[in-house]
Amino acid sequence: MTNSPSKVFAIVAGEISGDILGAGLVNSLKKRYPDARFIGIGGPRMQALGFESLFPMEELSIMGLVEVLSHLPRLLHIRSSLVKQITELAPDCFIGIDAPDFNIGVELKLKAKGIKTVHYVSPSVWAWRPKRIFKIAKATNMVLSLLPFEKAFYDQHQVPCTFVGHTLADDIPMHSDKLAARQLLGLDPNAEYLAVLPGSRGGELKQLAEPFVKAAQLVKQTFPDIKFVTPVVNDARRQQFLAALEEFAPDLEVTIVEGQSREVMAAADCILLASGTATLEAMLVKRPMVVSYRVSPITYAIAIKMMKIKNYSLPNLLANDTIVPELMQANCQPQLIADAIIKQLNQDFAPLNTRFEELHQLLKCNASERAADAVVALLQTP
C-alpha cells in the first residue's frame, strides 16, 4: 500500500467497455489509496465502487462521425462543464478511458492547467489518422495500451506508453464451459445455438439489427434446429431489438437475455457480432465468429479515406492475419453473413481455437494492477 494523503482521481469512461476497464482500475487504485476519491463520468460498474458520475455515461456513447454531429452541442457542453469542475477539483491525476475524440480534448485542457493526464486505451492511431499521435503527445503524460503492437508505435514517436494487457484476458478463463453457461441462462443443453449481438448502442442496432436477424433466418433454412440467443444491455435496447424482429423476422424465435453477454457467447456454438471490444471477448471465450458492421454511408466515405489497415476486428489485428471473417459496410448483407456463419458451423474449429489460446496468453498480464502501478509511478514523478 502506498503511504500518501488522500488522492483524488478524475476519470471519464464513455461506454460499457470503458466502464469495465474503469472499474478494474478503480479497484486496483483503491488497494493503493484506500481513502481516494473517484469522480468524473462512469457507468454502473464504476459507480458500484463509489465512483461519482457527474453525467450519464450513455451521453458519450455515440457511434459514427455523422451521428456525433447531431449531438455535438450537448457533447461540447458536457466537456466544457467537466473541464471546469475537474479544474476546480484539482485532482492528482485525470484518466481518460477510451472515447478519444472526447477525452483527448479534455486531457489537452487539463494538462495545460498542470494536471497530470493518462489516456487508458490507445486510440487506433496505427490504423487511421496517425497524425493524432502528436495531439496525444501534447495532451497526455502517459498512454496505457491494451495491445502489444501499440507500444512499439508509441516508442517510435517518443510518446510515453505502458503496455498493460487487457482486463478481459485476465477475467475470462482459458476454457469457457458451454454447458455451464447454458445452465445459467436456462438454455437447451443439447441444441445448436447462434448468438446474435448487433451491438450495445442504439445507433449500432439501428444499422445492424435488420441484416443480422435476416441472416439468422437464412441460417435456419440450412440448420432447421438451430436456436438463437441475443443479449441486450438494457430495456431500451431490448425494445429496439424486438421492434426489428417484428419488422424483419416476425417468425424468428430468439431468446433475449438482459446483460450477461459473455455468458451468451460462452453458451453459443457460433457468434454473429458487431466489430469492437465484443470481438475480443468472443475470441477469449474461444468461439467461432462472424464479424459484420456498417455505419452511415457518409461516415464510411469519410473514414475509409483515413484508414491504414486491411482488417477491423481485434482478433485479426492481434493475429496480423484474417483469422475470422469480416463483412463490412457493403458486405454487411444477410446472405453473405449467413453464408459465413454456415461455413463456420461446418468447419473444424481446433486450429482457430489454438490461435485464440495463443492470443489470449499474449494479453493476459493482470492489466488493472499494471495500469494502477503505472499511474502510481506517474504520480511519484515530479
From Swiss-Prot:
GO-annotated cellular components: membrane
Sorted UniProt keywords: Glycosyltransferase, Lipid A biosynthesis, Lipid biosynthesis, Lipid metabolism, Transferase
Keyword ATP-binding: no
GO molecular function: lipid-A-disaccharide synthase activity; phospholipid binding
SUPFAM superfamilies: UDP-Glycosyltransferase/glycogen phosphorylase
Broad EC category: transferase
Catalysed reactions listed for this entry: a lipid X + a UDP-2-N,3-O-bis[(3R)-3-hydroxyacyl]-alpha-D-glucosamine = a lipid A disaccharide + UDP + H(+)
Family per record: Belongs to the LpxB family.
UniProt cross-references to NCBIfam families, sorted A to Z: lpxB
Function: Condensation of UDP-2,3-diacylglucosamine and 2,3-diacylglucosamine-1-phosphate to form lipid A disaccharide, a precursor of lipid A, a phosphorylated glycolipid that anchors the lipopolysaccharide to the outer membrane of the cell.
Name the record gives this protein: Lipid-A-disaccharide synthase
